[in-house]
């Protein structure tokens, strides 16, 4: 079973929805107005903040921040929404574990592990020597160590991701060198 590293945000792929800031705010206000007394969590729609992310990319994204309340606990939740990414072969249903057994299950769809690896590999190649995001290397290592990865599907996902992001494959990258691997 995959033991995930801690993360501070939720990453979503926006499909069949505009990345217009005003539209996203309305959508999140509607989501926040849905009451679920079973879990006791309240999302404060008046605290909504939306900021552009990945503005240098083909399809800029949006970071949505909102306060969540559980009794006296207040926590800011950050949701990064990307647009225009490809998922190979397609988004897959995710069996997401719940902390409370009496709360209704959530229906989620997620990237295939092969697409997840392809995107992390793309980040490694795109940043090459300037990559300070060791989390991508750790994540790829963990995914290969703890899961069976379909190598054919992975190759397809890498090709699709690089093509979609207009990134040519380059040989002799510094990140594949011994010097990069042993650099402290």
Regions found by a protein language model. Give the residues of each.
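Compositionally biased terminal segments of proteins
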Residues: 2-184
């Amino acid at each position: 079973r995959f033991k995930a590293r801690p993360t501070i945000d939720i990453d979503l792929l926006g499909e069949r929805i505009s990345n217009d800031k005003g539209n996203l705010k309305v959508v999140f206000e509607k989501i926040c107005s849905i009451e679920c007394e079973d879990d006791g969590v309240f999302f404060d729609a008046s605290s909504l903040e939306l900021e552009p992310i990945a503005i240098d990319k083909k399809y800029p994204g949006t970071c949505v921040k909102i306060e969540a309340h559980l009794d006296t606990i207040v926590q800011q939740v950050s949701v990064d929404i990307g647009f225009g990414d490809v998922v190979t072969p397609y988004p897959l249903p995710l069996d997401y574990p719940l902390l409370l057994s009496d709360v209704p299950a959530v229906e989620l769809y997620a990237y295939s592990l092969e697409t997840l690896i392809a995107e992390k590999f793309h980040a490694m190649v795109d940043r090459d020597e300037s990559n300070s995001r060791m989390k991508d290397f750790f994540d790829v290592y963990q995914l290969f160590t703890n899961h069976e990865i379909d190598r054919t599907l992975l190759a397809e996902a890498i090709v699709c991701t690089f093509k979609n992001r207009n990134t040519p494959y380059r040989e002799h990258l510094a990140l594949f060198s011994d010097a990069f691997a042993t650099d402290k």
